[in-house]
Swiss-Prot record:
Name of the protein: Maestro heat-like repeat-containing protein family member 2A
PANTHER family recorded: MAESTRO HEAT-LIKE REPEAT-CONTAINING PROTEIN FAMILY MEMBER 2A (PTHR23120:SF14), MAESTRO-RELATED HEAT DOMAIN-CONTAINING (PTHR23120)
GO cellular component, one term: cytoplasm
HEAT repeats: 73-96, 97-133, 195-234, 254-292, 382-419, 424-461, 573-612, 615-641, 642-679, 739-776, 993-1030, 1221-1263, 1381-1420, 1627-1674
SUPFAM superfamilies for the chain: ARM repeat (SSF48371)
Keywords linked to the UniProt accession: Repeat
InterPro entries, alphabetized: ARM-like, ARM-type_fold, HEAT_Maestro, HEAT_MROH2B-like, Maestro-like_HEAT, Maestro_heat-like_prot, MROH2B-like_N_HEAT
The organism's taxonomic lineage, starting at the top: Eukaryota, Metazoa, Chordata, Craniata, Vertebrata
Gene3D superfamilies: Leucine-rich Repeat Variant
Disordered: annotated segments: 1-26
Native organism: Homo sapiens (Human)
UniProt entry tagged with the keyword Coiled coil: no
Length: 1674
């Protein structure tokens, strides 16, 4: 870009140098500044393009770039200007860029002032060239800025610029358009510098006129000439300031005139309208130079026809008229009128413009008309006679537009400013006007009236006294007649006539205020106009005019000769008639442009003529009335107040005439005026009022009666307005004539009763049978109106009879249609109001109250409840409200009944539609009457009880499903709350819970779907809060008040979420104001109303419950049970899941803060568990942490039954320790476990829960341990419980669910395979099942062994027997867990304690078993605890209590001995050996079994130290061992044989240790062989022992066990066979024989057979009588 600019600059320099030899090529002085300016220009160009594209304003970057260039120019102007000039010389530069550069150059020139001459020359040359190029669309803009640049340079370099322009301005050579434009700009901006060049410039331009054929160059020349002439005029005015050689005004005029002539004669006829307009605009400044010249002025006149010809063209005529006005006005000023020969042409052309409607294209028609008027005024001053003659000729055309236009011109001429028009001109003008007064067209009449008024205003009053006033009177009468008899079809004519009347009134006002010496005839005409006209809008100006005239006459100013000798009083009609007329008209003082003040002023002026006695009073009173009207407008005044003032004025006036018949005559006039006004109207209403007041002051009762009867007969009772007016008139009359009024009514009733058969009056005509009811309605209201206006002392004597009695009679004796009902209600209201208004009623009892009440109640009940067709019910309730204030008062029951009936009658009505205004009014009145009645009835019981009864009556409507019923009920509630709050003088505290109940009723309505209901509910709530605050002396903080106001605003929203949020915030704000009791009552009411309406109401209720519980839960410890009960009672009836869930969430919220109370209350619910209660627990299960907490608490409840009862130290303890049904507790646990996530293994309390359930199951198997409270809980089961719902089954189901969570298939399989659940369910096998379950838990429930062990130890230490038993059964001594968890010692101590107790056998057995199991679980610790173990296990052997205990003791010893040595056993070995042998022959198979096993274990343990002792024990035990080897109990027999063979070695005989014989031989045979061998050995080695064995054996023949008896017989035989003779001889054979023979009687044949065999052996031994040797016996 820079290179292109440089090349262009050099090329341009060469070109310019050809034109200017003194300018050399440019040099670059500062390449940095040059480049910066170029870059800034690029920014300007780019931003300009963006601005053009987007349509946005000037960009900030463009402005900033321009500012930077300007700052650069401040420091380096030449460099910047040269750079900009170079940029202009680029060949293909855009037009916009050139425009931007020229604009910057203009700013720099303006900023810097003088520049370097070389720069200026170069810039002038370039700008001149740009300006003179053929302008295209964009080029025109470029030429314009180039021209502006030259003008800017001319301020400091005028000569250079002027030289350049003059160089291109050559005679007879048409120059460029912008050269002329620029010269005009130079002349305008440099007046004095340009003047020396003005002459040559004008002369040169004149030579170009013939060459200028194009429109643009002609427009440019015209515009330049306009500027040149204005500049010359400025120069001539400031001639003394010029320092250049000057030209005179004449010289300038001579220079201009040729051009003026050429413009008018040639260019003005150009077809182009823009050229024409340019010419016309240039003529005005040119004429400013030409017209002052006397010689040239005459020549200018010659060209006027050419100007007038332009009116026929399309040119805007305003500019032509302005030129003509300039010529005509200067002709008057210079007193050189235009030639008379041109007058007719001027008159005609201008008159046509005035009278004809301007073409649509002429936008300045009104301004043109004003200019025309000035032209005619100028012509009238020069040629008045000729002009009026022309006007006269034009008026003869009979065209309305021509006549109106001409008359308007005459009016303008008459009203011409100084100098005033000549008298001759005025005289001639009036002649023209008089010639047209017979024209009846509206516009012509108005124009004539305007001229008459204008003549009066301009001081020509004498010229209109005759014809003018007469014409005015005629027009006043004519226009009034036409307006009062107008027809609808001729609206346009009526509008025109109204305009004529308005102009007439204005003219009358002008004349009466300015014309002196007014004729009496005109006065009379105006006065009669007031009395007769029906067109009341004309009254104000007429009254003003009359007042002015009357003041002139009364003050003697310019009195007419005909009345000069008369009195100062003004001639008037009858004074009473005039006063009546004016009073009635003044009742609407602002009609007719404020006629009230005008009439008051007239009345004050005529006071001496109307009633001299009232004059002084009227002077004061009327002034006050006028002041009142002046202080108000028709928008601010009060009709009632104004009428009261007029009535008071009338009463004060009548007082001045007291004692005369003046008031009676006035009454007649007022009565006569009634027919003059339509019904309805304010004037007629005031007439009835004024008539009533006037009649009340009448002295002659008979004449008053006549007037009243006349009024009754002539009244049309079908017209409500007239009927009401007569009623009011009678009432007002009753103030002073009550007896007269009642007599008239009675007389009228009798007459119509008589005429009812003959149909003599129109009221009873056959074709209008309904009229009878209309008259009766009017009579009822008349009686009540008489009561309302009657004097209080007279009323008490007349109210029951005849007034109320007549009202009731007329009602019950008619058809009782709607109109009659309304009249009856109005009558009752008026009568009761009148009674209530009496201040001192004393003990007055209204005798008719009961009758009236019954009638009214019947009417209300008869009204339809679904629609509203009349105001009857509203009036009925209003009547009841007034009746309620009279004695005898209604009772409380009657009050409630009236409230209920009235509420039902109104609230059930549906809201009216928006388009039915009449129904809306009826509806509003009914609602207002209901409020008034409720207020009256509430006032009789203004205490909390009355308030509560009122709220109870409204409650069913507040909870209605119909929104319109809710809205009205809540609105009524609000109104009554306001009454209660503001009417209670003494603060009576609400009952406990009443505040909460009322808030609970209304709070959900803040979320109602209807906005008005929400807002009314909010206001009710505010009233309740204010009442509560006043009673509790609590103050609302500003923050709370502000928050409530904000919530109130949010309730107006239509967003449901926003509404609920606002209601929640309200609950949050107010909840702290409630006591705990009030919170309970609130929640109870909210729960009670849940489900009564709709879902939105229910959501709002539970939302409030939730917020109150959330905010106040901690404080409600004593009320939790009541709240929970309220929620649970109503929860089953709630259908919507969301609402149910919110209520349940409220329960859970309470449970978080008062867990024990809630838990106890829930557990005390009846079984089987209802669905809503199950839903509560399901909700608990969804909150896993809380569910765990609840499970802990439930476990605690079960555990508390198995622990000693403790004393409660807190309220929570009381609830925790309260008795609950364990079955409900177990069912709840089962439900929670079932609903919790199956993947949740409940690691934190799984062992506790398992253990607790085991304990519960154990206690259920021991019914004697169950608490007596269970019997009580069985009573609440309303239905029989299912079979599966018992303690054992529910407990086992719960345990099964718990073990499923262990996720061990092997455990589940083992539990089923070993039938653990069946064992646990059966009480007989429970302990076995517990032990088995405990072993399985140790194997499969990893991670919980320590906790289970701890729980077991705690249970073993419990005071509850069942708990100790179950815990001991679970005791994990058979496993290593106790040892591993270092719990072995406490376990041993507890087991030791259990083994010692004697109260329960099972516990002892289990304790011993557990002690014995130490050898299995902690064998290494057996030696440590050997003393305790041996002692506790030996105890049952030493002192046997039961077989099971002894057996368990022996088994435990057996287990223990396995881990001990002989030395460890110590002295206990002897005891064990001795005690063990005792049980060899025990009847219990178990004991025998355990004894044999233990003895065998002892045989293994015995060492060297005890071997000898035990050898003796073996000898002692040998016979039992050999005999019990054949024990009937197979297990015992096997154990015994094993033990026996284990003890054989103690005999020291090797042959016995390995018994001979085959192994497959039978056991009995083996035993026989062993016995035989044993006996043979003993015979040889220890025959004495064998002898003792025989005796011991024979003792067993009497054993209880048959098998033992058989074995004894067989063993005895074997011994006897092996016994030596020596010892045989010692035998007592008889005794032995007897013993064996006794066995022959044994029931067992085997015994008998064995005994027989033994007996045979015995006999054999005794027969031989010798001692057999051992060898022989073998």
């Amino acid at each position: 870009m820079t290179e292109a600019i440089t090349e262009a600059a050099v090329a341009s320099s060469e070109e310019v140098s050809e034109e200017r030899d003194d300018l050399g090529p440019l040099e670059l002085h500062d390449s940095g500044t040059f480049q910066q300016v170029v870059n800034l220009l690029d920014i300007i160009d780019s931003e300009s393009a963006k601005t053009d594209t987007t349509g946005a304003g000037l960009d900030m970057r463009k402005t900033l770039a321009s500012v930077i260039i300007m700052e650069k120019a401040t420091t380096e102007p030449s460099v910047v200007i040269n750079t900009l000039i170079r940029c202009l010389q680029v060949p293909e530069i855009s037009t916009q860029r050139k425009v931007n550069i020229y604009n910057i150059l203009q700013d720099i020139i303006q900023q810097e002032g003088e520049l370097e001459e070389q720069c200026v020359q170069r810039l002038v040359a370039i700008a001149s060239k740009e300006m003179r190029e053929i302008p295209e669309m964009e080029g025109y803009m470029k030429a314009e800025v180039a021209s502006d640049t030259l003008v800017a340079l001319s301020r400091n370099h005028f000569s250079l610029v002027m030289y350049e322009l003059q160089h291109h301005l050559k005679p007879l050579n048409l120059t460029d358009e912008f050269v002329i434009i620029t010269l005009a700009k130079l002349a305008n901006g440099n007046v004095f510098e340009f003047m020396p060049y003005m002459g040559i410039t004008l002369a040169t331009i004149f030579t170009m006129l013939r060459l200028a054929n194009e429109a643009k160059i002609r427009q440019a020349i015209c515009s330049a000439m306009e500027t040149f002439c204005e500049t010359v005029q400025f120069y001539l005015k400031h001639l003394e300031e010029s320092v250049y050689p000057v030209m005179t005004e004449e010289e300038f005029a001579l220079k201009v005139f040729p051009m003026y002539r050429y413009f008018v004669t040639v260019w003005l006829r150009h077809y182009n309208p823009e050229v024409k307009l340019g010419v016309i605009k240039s003529l005005k400044p040119m004429l400013g130079l030409l017209l002052p010249n006397d010689d040239l002025r005459e020549q200018v006149y010659d060209y006027i026809p050419l100007l007038l010809a332009e009116y026929q063209g399309s040119l805007e005529v305003l500019f032509v008229t302005q030129v003509l006005r300039q010529i005509l006005e200067l002709s008057v000023t210079t007193n050189t009128p235009v030639p008379q020969m041109q007058l007719h042409t001027i008159f005609t052309e201008l008159h046509v413009q005035v009278c004809n409607k301007a073409p649509a294209q002429h936008q300045y028609s009104s301004q043109n008309l004003m200019e025309m008027v000035h032209c005619f005024v100028a012509l009238a001053r020069s040629y008045p006679k000729e002009l009026m003659k022309f006007f006269f000729s034009q008026m003869e055309t009979n065209k309305e537009a021509v006549r109106v236009g001409t008359l308007n011109l005459i009016r303008a001429i008459v009203s011409a400013d100084e100098p005033r028009m000549s008298i001759r001109a005025i005289y001639l003008a009036i002649r023209v006007v008089k010639n047209t007064i017979s024209d009846t067209r509206s516009k012509v009449r108005m124009a004539i009236l305007h001229i008459i008024g204008q003549l009066a205003l301009c001081g020509y009053q004498e010229r209109i006294k005759g014809w003018g006033l007469k014409y005015l009177s005629v027009q006043l009468t004519l226009s009034t007649y036409k307006l009062t008899n107008r027809r609808e079809k001729f609206y346009q004519r009526d509008l025109e006539e109204r305009m004529v009347h308005k102009v007439t009134m204005d003219t009358v006002k002008i004349i009466t205020s300015s014309v002196s010496g007014m004729t009496t005839e005109f006065w009379v005409r105006l006065l009669c106009y007031i009395m007769e006209t029906d067109y009341v809008e004309a009254l104000t100006p007429i009254c003003i005019s009359l007042t002015n005239l009357a003041e002139h006459q009364l003050h003697g100013q310019d009195v007419d000769v005909s009345v000069a000798g008369k009195s100062r009083q003004v001639d008037l009609p009858a004074p009473q008639k005039l006063l009546a007329r004016l009073l009635v008209l003044m009742s609407s003082p602002y009609k007719g442009e404020g006629r009230g003040i005008a009439m008051l002023n007239l009345l004050r002026t005529l006071s001496q003529s109307i009633a001299p006695s009232m004059a002084d009073m009227w002077e004061l009173e009327i002034a006050l009335l006028v002041r009142y009207l002046e202080e108000h407008t028709e928008f601010t005044w009060d009709q009632k107040a104004w009428e009261d003032k007029l009535i008071q004025f009338l009463r004060n006036s009548l007082k001045k005439t007291r004692g005369s018949s003046w008031s009676l005559r006035l009454s007649k006039e007022l009565n006569n005026q009634i027919a003059s006004f339509d019904s309805p109207s304010l004037e007629k209403g005031f007439l009835y009022r004024a008539l009533g007041f006037t009649l009340a002051t009448g002295l002659e009762a008979s004449k008053v009666e006549v007037l009243l009867l006349e009024l009754l007969y002539k009244t049309d009772y079908s017209n409500d307005f007239d009927s009401e007016g007569v009623i009011m008139c009678f009432g007002l009359c009753a103030r002073g004539q009550v007896k007269t009024v009642l007599n008239v009514l009675h007389d009228f009733e009798e007459r119509i009763q008589e005429s009812e058969q003959s149909w003599q009056i129109s009221a009873w005509r056959k074709d209008h049978p309904w009229r009878r009811e209309t008259v009766k309605s009017a009579l009822m209201v008349m009686y009540s109106c008489v009561a309302s206006y009657c004097h209080p002392q007279l009323l008490l004597n007349l109210v029951d009879s005849p007034i109320t009695a007549k009202i009731i009679h007329h009602y019950v004796s008619s058809c009782q249609d709607i109109c009659l009902k309304m009249a009856f209600m109005k009558s009752v209201v008026q009568v009761t109001k009148a009674i209530n208004n009496i201040k001192d009623l004393e003990d007055f009892h209204f005798a008719q109250k009961t009758t009236l009440t019954s009638i009214i109640v019947a009417v209300i009940k008869a009204e339809p409840t679904d629609n509203l067709v009349s105001p009857v019910r509203a009036l009925a309730m209003e009547a009841l409200s007034h009746l309620s204030k009279l004695k005898p008062f209604y009772s409380t029951e009657e009050n409630s009944e009236l409230m209920d009936i009235s509420i039902h009658s109104v609230i059930s009505l549906q809201l009216p539609g928006e388009d039915n205004e009449s129904i809306k009014t009826l509806y509003a009145n009914a609602l207002s009457s209901l409020e008034q009645l409720m207020e009256s009835l509430l006032q009789r019981q203004l205490d909390p009880k009355g308030l509560q009864e009122m709220v109870q009556l409204l409650e069913k409507w507040i909870l209605s499903e119909k929104e319109w019923e809710r809205e009205k009920a809540v609105s009524l509630h609000l109104y009554l709350m306001w009454i209660y709050v503001h009417s209670t003088a003494v603060c009576i505290h609400l009952k406990l819970g009443q505040f909460g109940t009322m808030v609970g009723l209304i709070a959900p309505c803040t979320c109602d779907a209807h906005q008005r209901t929400r807002m009314a509910s909010m206001n009710v709530l505010s009233s309740l809060l204010d009442l509560h605050a006043s009673q509790t002396c609590s103050l609302w903080g500003p923050s709370k008040q502000k928050e409530l106001e904000k919530c109130k605003g949010d309730l107006q929203s239509t967003d449901v979420e926003k509404i609920f949020c606002a209601s929640s915030r309200i609950a949050k704000v107010v909840c702290m104001e409630f006591s705990c009791d009030e919170v309970v009552s609130l929640i109870q009411k909210l729960c009670e109303n849940t489900g009564a309406m709709n879902l939105q109401h229910d959501k709002a209720s539970v939302t409030w419950i939730a917020f109150f519980l959330q905010m106040r839960a901690k404080e409600l410890e004593d009320k939790v049970a009541e709240i929970l009960s309220a929620i649970l009672v109503h929860l089953p009836v709630v259908d919507h899941p969301e609402v149910r869930r919110l209520l349940i969430d409220g329960i859970l919220l309470l449970a978080h803060h008062h867990q024990e109370t809630i838990l106890t209350s829930l557990l005390r619910q009846p079984l089987p568990m209802e669905s809503h209660l199950a839903e509560v627990w399901l909700a608990v299960s969804e909150n896993v942490p809380f569910a765990r907490t609840m499970l802990h608490s439930l476990m605690g409840r079960l555990q508390s039954r198995l622990s000693p009862r403790i004393s409660a130290t807190s309220k929570a303890d009381i609830w925790r320790l309260a008795a609950v049904d364990p079955l409900m507790t177990l069912c709840t646990i089962h439900l929670l476990i079932q609903k919790l996530d199956e993947n949740d293994k409940l690691p934190d309390f799984l062992p506790d829960l398992i253990y607790t359930l085991l304990l519960q199951l154990g206690s259920s198997h021991r019914p004697e341990a169950a608490p007596p409270v269970l019997k009580m809980w069985k009573l609440v089961h309303t239905t029989p419980l299912p079979e599966e719902m018992n303690l054992q089954r529910v407990t086992i189901k719960s345990m099964q669910l718990l073990f499923k969570r262990v996720k061990s298939q092997h455990l589940a399989h083992t539990l089923d395979e070993q039938a653990v659940w069946d064992l646990l369910q059966d009480g007989g096998t429970f302990l076995e099942g517990v032990s088995l379950l405990a072993r399985l838990c140790m194997q499969h429930v990893e991670g919980h062994r320590q906790r289970l062990a701890e729980l077991v130890l705690r249970g073993m230490d419990s005071e509850v027997l069942s708990c100790r038993i179950s815990s001991t059964a679970v005791c994990f001594m058979s496993g290593p867990v106790l040892y591993q968890e270092k719990l072995l010692k406490p376990a041993a101590l507890l087991l030791e304690k259990g083994a010692d107790q004697e109260e329960d056998e099972a516990l002892r057995v289990l304790s011993l078993r557990a002690l014995g199991n130490m050898a299995l679980g902690a064998p290494k610790k057996v030696k440590q605890y050997r003393k305790v173990l041996l002692e506790k296990c030996l105890g049952p052997l030493r002192e046997p209590v039961s077989n099971s205990v002894t057996a368990e003791g022996m088994e435990a010893l057996t287990k223990i001995l396995a881990e001990l040595r002989e030395g460890d056993v110590g002295s206990s070995f002897d005891a064990m050996s001795e005690q063990c042998r005792i049980f060899f022959d025990n009847e219990s198979e178990l004991l025998r079994l355990k004894a044999f096993i233990l003895f065998g274990k002892l045989a293994r343990v015995v060492g060297m130290s005890k071997k000898h002792f035990f050898k003796g024990e073996v000898k002692k035990a040998w016979i039992p061992l050999m005999l019990h080897s054949q024990d009937p109990c197979s297990n015992a027999a096997q154990a015994c044989m094993a033990t026996m063979f284990q003890c054989v070695h103690f005999w020291g005989w090797k042959s016995l240790e390995h018994p001979s014989g085959p192994s497959d031989t039978a056991t009995d045979d083996k035993m026989t062989v062993f016995q035989t061998t044993m006996c043979s050995i003993l015979t040889r080695k220890k025959p004495a022992v064998l002898y003792r064995f025989l005796l011991e054996t024979m003792a067993y023949v009497k054993n209880n066990l048959s098998r033992i008896r058989i074995a004894a017989c067989n063993l005895a035989g074997i011994i006897m066979k092996q016994m030596s003779t020596h010892y045989l001889k010692k035998l007592d054979f008889p005794a032995l024989r007897n013993s064996l023979q006794e066995l022959q009687l044994d029931p067992d044949p085997g015994v008998r057979r064995a005994a027989l065999e033994t007996l045979t052996v015995l006999d054999s031994c005794s027969q031989h009588g010798f001692l057999a040797s051992p060898q022989g016996m073998s």
